[in-house]
Amino acid sequence: MLQTALDYLDTDLQIKARKALDAMRADPALKAMGVDGIAVSETMRHLSTQMAYYSRGRMPVPDVKAMYAAAGLWKISDKEAVKSITWTLESKHLLGKAIDLVPLRRGSTWWIAPDSVWSRMGEIGEQHGLSWGGRWKKRDTPHFEM
């Protein structure tokens, strides 16, 4: 089960994340790019969820699907199951020190937003004291942490 409430986060991150979210939601540049909101896609993460994410691209598809089911996650497609999405079992999400944010367009999550949208979100997050995963060698554009 995915946690999306900011209350699950470390207190310092809650404060910074709220300010960053408010700034992103009010940002005229993001609005001009077609963003009509920002959603929290994940905050605190259970170890079973992290293990399911980590299994993608590393285990046979049926095993990945079983891991997702055991963690209470959505039914993952074969295409998703073979694509790696995390490179660690020690995510800061496990400690409540990370948050994933996604832009909304026409009220729906916009995972395939252009780089300019993710970059602007990253800049705003950094202005509020967050480290942005879009700067990493293996980019994680929705990810912000302390």
Task: Place the predicted regions along the sequence by residue.
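Acidic helix-start/capping segments at beta-turn-to-alpha-helix junctions
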Residues: 36-55
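Glycine-rich, histidine-containing beta strand-loop boundary motifs that form or position
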Residues: 42, 72, 136
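Short regulatory "switch" loops immediately downstream of catalytic or recognition motifs
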Residues: 23-28, 55-63, 104-106
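Mixed-charge, low-complexity intrinsically disordered segments
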Residues: 51-91
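Short aromatic/hydrophobic-glycine micro-motifs
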Residues: 29, 35, 58, 129-132
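Active-site acidic/histidine clusters and adjacent loop/turn architecture
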Residues: 1-42
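Catalytic cores and adjacent binding grooves of peptidoglycan-active enzymes
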Residues: 75-146
